[in-house]
Amino acid sequence: MKRIVVTFDCKYKHAVRAYLVSNRVQYSMSTDIYTGDVHVYVPHVKGVALLAELRRLSVPYRLV
């Protein structure tokens, strides 16, 4: 299964987690303790919708 890895600042962590839980997306989340970046691993199909939601919320993100 293809996965998307999205990285963003930790201040958006709760908003992104709320979106993932409310839409029943299986995800894995980790936080880099040195930079404060959050990495979210989601299936490719759900990742496209997540990217659209991040754009809607104006969350700056990077694809890894």
Language model segments and positions:
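Short, intrinsically disordered low-complexity segments
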Residues: 1-2, 23, 61
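Surface-exposed beta-strand edges and flanking loops
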Residues: 6-8, 31, 42, 63
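Short amphipathic alpha-helix segments
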Residues: 7-26
